[in-house]
Swiss-Prot record:
Involved in DNA double-strand break (DSB) repair. Probably acts with NurA to stimulate resection of the 5' strand and produce the long 3' single-strand that is required for RadA loading. Has DNA-dependent ATPase activity and DNA helicase activity. It catalyses: Couples ATP hydrolysis with the unwinding of duplex DNA at the replication fork by translocating in the 5'-3' direction. This creates two antiparallel DNA single strands (ssDNA). The leading ssDNA polymer is the template for DNA polymerase III holoenzyme which synthesizes a continuous strand; ATP + H2O = ADP + phosphate + H(+); Couples ATP hydrolysis with the unwinding of duplex DNA by translocating in the 3'-5' direction. SUPFAM superfamilies: P-loop containing nucleoside triphosphate hydrolases. This is DNA double-strand break repair helicase HerA. Its EC number is 5.6.2.3, 5.6.2.4. Helicase activity is stimulated in the presence of NurA.
């Protein structure tokens, strides 16, 4: 047994108990302790409350004056009547290296001991990727089950500056360097473009510019991309006619060339005052007169397209973004040059393509294994071979981490990015597509998606609305654990869910202190050093004005 810390007293059940703390012991909030139930089985629990009681001063009728008189009267004997009492929440009964539900109450008078580091390590396990240590036990390493983390999805939630990006970087390191998995990070702010892994440096980091194949967009997606309001239905109608016509007549074009062809067609409509367009339904070209009041409508579309090309022409590509993903690496999609609406379009198309290719590959693989007909087996093998050739990373499971997930899947809003994220959350485990969502405002994140993130890494959250929202969306998160979250320090987290054997308060490793063959880990996302910047500006200004000031 470890250190003897107290004796069970008062009301005790199969879910909780109190114990009087040994005066020579040091017992903190969150400490792990063990005792025996009435059947003699070892029971593990955590200290949830610690209170100090003095029986000589505990009268409810006491006021300041009477307390002062009592202190003077009792003198040194006060200390002899003082007691520190701890309340314990029972986590379970220990069976081998597992915890099972405890269904037998604790007997008064049982001795309570601190749980040993070895016992805790055995329970938390030694398999998986290492993310940190128990907050109160730095020798107990916390590992996350990779299968559960990826296939059942996860969320990293916290206020700004609490350590979200650091936690994500530690997870990436574990999956890419330790396991050899493939990770994609959708990065709205460019926080990971300078990512450097401890063991391999930048060798396993693939930076991909967030661009989009214009030819893959439908009319509504194109309207969103170039900034036509969803309420501008007439503009969207004419854009739809023109877009379908241009794509039909110029099937070999892509990228900016296709947009230039679209501009040519719109200008032709204005100059001829006639709309000639392709009707997919009838399978032929049709024409109608362009009413004079609609000329300005079309000019508005032209203005939007030209402005888009001027400001964002560099995000248009004819290359396939999904084909750029490299297996066994962290692939950072840099979305920072885009505005939020454009990000949603790019992310929606990208995730849809990733998911569809994974579904196609896994369905072909399963049918190939079951099929007895050589002809059918050859067909399925051809599908797999084509994907392995064009999209080598998608022949294997993949994890997609969505930073600032509330941008792409906001509560109460419909968009393509949110719909495909929801589908991955529901069906991704069947096809080897894992989803990780990261957010500083969980209450703004789609509740259905958040609830399907079956492991939650929750750093400091102080907003009551965010706390209530996370609690509502988390079956594994108890109210008392939620109470811990507001008091967490930077880099400290509550981890609950299927990737960890039981909930834990964890000190997550500092990624920038993880040392390997390539040095220490690095990533962006730090706050700007405002004071240093201002001091530098002041020095430059003082020097230019030749003023004598001490710094």
């Amino acid at each position: 047994m470890e250190e003897f810390v107290g004796i069970v007293r008062g009301e005790a059940s199969f879910t909780s108990y109190e114990f009087s703390i040994n005066p020579s012991a040091n017992v903190s909030f969150g400490e792990f302790v063990v005792t025996k139930n009435r059947d003699g089985d070892l029971v593990l629990g955590t200290v949830r409350h610690v209170k100090n009681v003095n029986w000589l001063l505990s009268s409810v009728k006491s006021n300041f004056n009477s307390l002062a008189l009592d202190i003077e009267e009792y003198g040194e004997s006060l200390g002899e009547n003082e007691e520190v009492v701890a309340t314990v929440r029972i986590l379970g009964k220990i069976e081998g290296n597992e915890l099972v539900p405890n269904r037998v109450p604790i007997r008064n008078g049982e001795y309570v001991y601190k749980a040993s580091d070895d016992l805790l390590q055995m329970i938390y396990g030694n398999d998986g990727i290492e993310i940190g240590t128990l907050l109160l036990r730095p020798n107990v390493r916390i590992k996350l089950d990779v299968n559960e983390l990826v296939s059942r999805h996860f969320a990293v939630l916290a206020v700004t500056g609490a350590g979200k990006s650091n936690a994500v970087a530690v997870i990436i390191k574990g999956i890419v360097e330790d396991v050899g998995g493939t990770v994609v990070v959708l990065d709205p702010h460019g926080d990971y473009v300078n990512l450097r892994l401890p063991e391999t440096g930048i060798d396993l980091v693939n930076i991909i510019d967030g661009k989009i194949r214009i030819e893959d967009l439908d009319p509504e997606e194109l309207a969103d991309l170039i900034g036509i309001s969803s309420s501008a239905q007439i503009q969207r109608h004419f854009l739809s006619l023109a877009w379908e016509t241009v794509k039909h007549k110029n099937q070999s074009l892509g990228g900016e060339s296709l947009l230039e062809a679209l501009l040519d067609l719109l200008n032709e409509w204005i100059s001829r005052k006639t709309i000639k367009y392709w009707s997919e339904k009838e399978g032929r070209m049709k024409s109608e007169d362009l009413k004079s009041e609609r000329i300005e409508t079309i000019r508005g579309i032209i203005f939007r397209i030209r402005r888009f090309l001027r400001n964002y022409g560099n995000i248009v590509t004819s290359e396939n973004l999904v084909a750029a993903i490299k297996p066994g690496m962290v692939n950072v999609i840099d979305l920072s040059p885009l505005d939020e609406n454009q990000m949603k379009v790019v992310v929606g198309k990208f995730l849809e393509a990733v998911f569809e290719k994974r579904v196609e590959y896994e369905m072909a693989r399963k049918r190939f294994e079951k099929e007895t007909s050589k002809k059918k087996r050859d067909e399925y093998e051809e599908i797999m071979t084509e994907i392995e050739s064009k999209y080598p990373a998608l022949a294997y499971p993949i994890l997609v981490i969505v930073e600032e997930a509330h941008i792409f899947a906001p509560q109460g809003e419909e968009n393509d990015a949110m719909r495909i994220m929801g589908r991955i959350a529901r069906e991704g485990r069947k096809f080897g597509v894992g989803l990780g969502v990261v957010s500083q405002r969980p209450s703004k994140l789609n509740e259905d998606i958040l609830s399907q993130m079956n492991t939650k890494i929750i750093l400091r959250i102080v907003n009551p609305r965010d706390q209530d929202y996370v609690l509502k969306a988390s079956e594994q998160l108890s109210k008392d654990l939620m109470d811990d979250i507001a008091g967490l320090g930077k880099g400290e987290a509550v981890i609950v869910g299927q990737a960890i054997k039981l909930p834990a308060l964890v000190r997550i490793y500092n990624f920038k202190e993880l040392r390997g063959k390539a040095g220490t880990g690095q990533y962006g996302g730090e706050d700007i050093g405002i004071l240093d910047r201002w001091n530098k500006m002041k020095r430059n200004m003082v020097n230019s004005l030749d003023i004598d000031i001490d710094f």
